Structures are given as structure tokens and as C-alpha cells.
Curated annotation (Swiss-Prot):
Gene3D superfamilies in the record: SH2 domain (3.30.505.10)
Taxonomic lineage of the native organism: Eukaryota, Metazoa, Chordata, Craniata, Vertebrata
KW Phosphoprotein (keyword) present: yes
SUPFAM superfamilies linked to this entry: SH2 domain (SSF55550)
Listed name of the protein: SH2 domain-containing adapter protein F
């Protein structure tokens, strides 16, 4: 063997022994940028390290080092608060569906609805049919047709009042505001001492019974078949 080849072989053997003597690292050494010099003031302080946190992350930096078990309780509380807020924000339709209708008592006639009421008819304000006509809030006595229209002018559609008839002292008039204007319907007294509304209504014992009946039913009057007596116009007392 030539001297050059023997020297090369000895160098390779020596290098392999040194490599085997050095233990391999378990983890890779993370990259750390070298200091690029002193600060602009020349005080020898290193440049501040750049933050590697995401720009849109609002969490404090120390949360990145917390294990999942530490943050799990905080996340659970956040979900619980959000769930409670959504339960408190119920929509009107959902809240109305959840309400139970009030139980009717035998001693409270105002809580009972009239039998035979049309389901599609809107409900007007309740009228006590046993109360005398003079004590009803919607009875205005001897006022003219013009005065009745002036009272109804600022009211909503289906507002009404009852007044004395200007042509017959034994009859009354029902003044009603419709979408087309004002309507004046006669409440006539029959020979049997009953009262009828117009020409197509059944007889009633009193005018308050008529108002109570048509507060939940359609009026039998041409041009007002779609309407009910919904909003009484109360008399003004001084």
C-alpha cells in the first residue's frame, strides 16, 4: 500500500470515531435570529425581537403557553353565557305560543267568550250587556250626525258610538267609521219591544246586547259585512 493511501485511510477511521462519540440531539434547535448590532442610541442594547403572534389574534400572549385543560373552563363559561342570552331573546310569536290561556271562572262573566263566535272575526272591547244603555261609555245621547262624525274622524277604522235617532225618539243610531268614510245605521224598536240593527239582524232585548253581539261577529249591513264593532268611542265627561 502506498503511503498516500494509508494516510487517507487513517484519516477516515479517525473521523468516524469522533462522529460516533458525539450524541445526536433529541430535538432540533429552534431558529433564533442573531443580534444585528446595537440600538440606534448606541447603548449596546439588542434590537427587540419581533412578535410571531397573528395580527388579528386578540388573545394575550401568555395564553399560547397555557395547556388546553386550563382554557377549557373559560370556553365552557363563554358558551353557557351565549346560550342563556339566546334563550332570553324569544321572538313575540314564540312567546305568545308558550303562554297558556287563562282559566275561566264561573263567577267572572267577563272572562267567558260568547258561544257561537266566528273564529275569523276580530274581537272588540268587551261590553256588559246587562249594564243599562245610559251607563255604557259608548252611548253619547242626543248628539247630531255631524257631531258623531267629528268624534269618529280622528279614530281608527271600526270605531263606533251610539246616539239618539234624530228622526224617531224611540230609536237609536249606530255611527261607525269604515275605510270608505262614516256609516250611520238605525237601531229600531219593534212592536215586541225588541231592537234590531238594520233590516237583517235578529231581534235583541236591548241595545247593549246588540253591541255585545256584534263586537265578535260581522255586521249584517251592506257595505260593512267585513266589519265588527271593535273600538268604542267613550263619551267625554267634564
Amino acid at each position: 500500500m502506498e503511503p498516500y493511501e494509508a494516510q487517507k485511510m487513517m484519516a477516515e477511521i479517525r473521523g468516524s470515531k469522533e462522529t460516533a462519540a458525539q450524541p445526536l440531539p433529541l430535538y432540533d434547535t429552534p431558529y433564533e435570529p442573531e443580534d444585528e448590532g446595537a440600538s440606534p442610541e448606541g447603548e449596546g442594547t439588542p434590537w427587540p425581537r419581533e412578535s410571531r403572534l397573528p395580527e388579528d389574534d386578540e388573545r394575550p400572549p401568555e395564553e399560547y403557553d397555557q395547556p388546553w385543560e386550563w382554557k377549557k373552563e373559560r370556553i365552557s363559561k363563554a358558551f353557557a353565557a351565549q346560550f342563556e342570552g339566546s334563550e332570553n331573546c324569544l321572538s313575540p310569536g314564540r312567546e305568545e305560543k308558550g303562554r297558556l290561556p287563562p282559566r275561566l271562572s264561573a263567577g267572572n262573566p267577563k272572562s267567558a267568550k260568547p258561544l257561537g263566535m266566528e273564529p275569523s272575526s276580530p274581537l272588540g272591547e268587551w261590553t256588559d250587556p246587562a249594564l243599562p244603555l245610559e251607563n255604557q261609555v259608548w252611548y253619547h245621547g242626543a248628539i247630531s250626525r255631524t257631531d258623531a262624525e267629528n268624534l269618529l274622524r280622528l279614530c281608527k277604522e271600526a270605531s263606533y258610538l251610539v246616539r239618539n235617532s234624530e228622526t224617531s225618539k224611540n230609536d237609536f243610531s249606530l255611527s261607525l267609521k269604515s275605510s270608505q268614510g262614516f256609516m250611520h245605521m238605525k237601531l229600531s224598536r219593534t212592536k215586541e219591544h225588541k231592537y234590531v240593527l238594520g233590516q237583517n239582524s235578529p231581534p235583541f232585548s236591548s241595545v247593549p246586547e246588540i253591541v255585545h253581539h256584534y263586537a265578535s261577529r260581522k255586521l249584517p249591513i251592506k257595505g260593512a259585512e267585513h266589519m265588527s264593532l271593535l273600538y268604542p268611542v267613550a263619551i267625554r265627561t267634564l
